[in-house]
């Protein structure tokens, strides 16, 4: 099953995350199928490729709780349901 989830990168004590599509059995920092965006919790900066996310959701990808919250904040989940 494909999941939309966060992949950590950055330095110690300064995490940044990429929003990626990955197989649910892969390690957190394993190989991603596709990069869909970026999230920095320190500066609360988010960059999302809406078209790619909607494409993956229509193909049946599931989201993790954190990614779902990020997408709700960006009002992308509402677009997907309409």
UniProtKB/Swiss-Prot annotation:
Pfam family, one: Ribosomal_S16
Protein location: Plastid, Chloroplast
InterPro entries tied to this protein: Ribosomal_bS16 (IPR000307), Ribosomal_bS16_CS (IPR020592), Ribosomal_bS16_dom_sf (IPR023803)
GO molecular function: structural constituent of ribosome
One GO CC term, this protein: chloroplast
Alphabetical list of HAMAP family matching this protein: Ribosomal_bS16
Protein name per its UniProtKB record: Small ribosomal subunit protein bS16c
Gene (name only): rps16
